[in-house]
Amino acid sequence: MPVIKVRENEPFDVALRRFKRSCEKAGVLSDVRSREFYEKPTTIRKRAKASAVKRHMKKLARENARRNRLY
């Protein structure tokens, strides 16, 4: 859990914004959302594999676009 020390004469809005930013960097909300419901291990592996395939296809598309620009 991220901890924020409120500085002297610091407005509440600014401290809240810093806290939200640190929570986002730590990945607290995404972790809570992923643990909200039980997910079977096979589903986790399937989703991870699908995201890896998607990343790979995106990388290939980027490389092909770069090659097409060169010629």
From Swiss-Prot:
Record GO terms (molecular function): structural constituent of ribosome
Keywords on record: Ribonucleoprotein, Ribosomal protein
Start-end of Basic and acidic residues biased regions: 60-71
One of the Pfam families matching this protein, by short name: Ribosomal_S21
InterPro entries for this protein: Ribosomal_bS21, Ribosomal_bS21_CS, Ribosomal_bS21_sf
Gene3D superfamilies reported in the protein's UniProt record: Ribosomal protein S8 (1.20.5.1150)
Protein's GO biological process: translation
Superkingdom, taxonomy of origin: Bacteria
Region described as Disordered: spans on this chain: 48-71
Biased composition (Basic residues): 48-59
Cellular compartments per GO CC: ribonucleoprotein complex; ribosome
Family of the protein in this entry: Belongs to the bacterial ribosomal protein bS21 family.
Record NCBIfam families: S21p
Identification of the protein by name: Small ribosomal subunit protein bS21
Organism in which the protein naturally occurs: Tolumonas auensis (strain DSM 9187 / NBRC 110442 / TA 4)
Organism classification: Bacteria, Pseudomonadati, Pseudomonadota, Gammaproteobacteria, Aeromonadales
